[in-house]
Amino acid sequence: VNNKVAQDTFTPGWLRSVGQGWIVWGLESFIDEVAVKANKDPVDFRLAMLDGKGKQGGKAPESVGGATRLANTLEILKKKTANVKLGADEGIGYSVSAGQERTMPAWLATAAHVHVNKRTGKITVKKLWVVSDAGIVIHPDGAMAQLEGSLLWGLSLALFEHNEVKNGQVSKTNLHTYLPLRMNDVPEMDIELVESEEFPVGLGEPGVIGVAPAIGNAVYQAI
């Protein structure tokens, strides 16, 4: 998905997960909208498209299995969230992300459980899940730390960090007004690394990009 419109509007700087941060947000939100219009379950709707055929097939050595590996992470995630009991004004949203066109791809499925206060509009994330296939995990503790940090950064970007441009410059210039995620906003997290014997790939960035669309899709379900 090309981000030409964004490039024509402003010049983005460096950020963990770079351009994919907003591309996947738009793409995965749109897929949920299509699923709703088609009266399909959003997870099953995605799984039906992830058949690993054609361009989805992957290539040796770094992306053997292609989209079938992404489908596997989503299947695992579906089972993890199957028995979650939702309260009033709560929802669970899903997203998937993969870097299959890059030389260091990873396949991830993300879910978010949210509560929406319909009176105030406040969104509370109660739990985040992520299932990741990054091939052989060389350093499990390091991989887990990467994904924990990714989920928290993604949550911070989605709900907390915001900076308006006024008169040609950003309006918030220090941390007393630019507020990132705080410790008391950290939700429960469930992270699973898929056991694999395939080529090991990077986990530094892909965990960030699935959080915002999962939250957005959960909010839609909640309201």
Which role fits each region the language model picked out?
Residues 1-103, 109-111, 115-223:
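C-terminal catalytic domains of large/alpha subunits in multi-subunit enzymes
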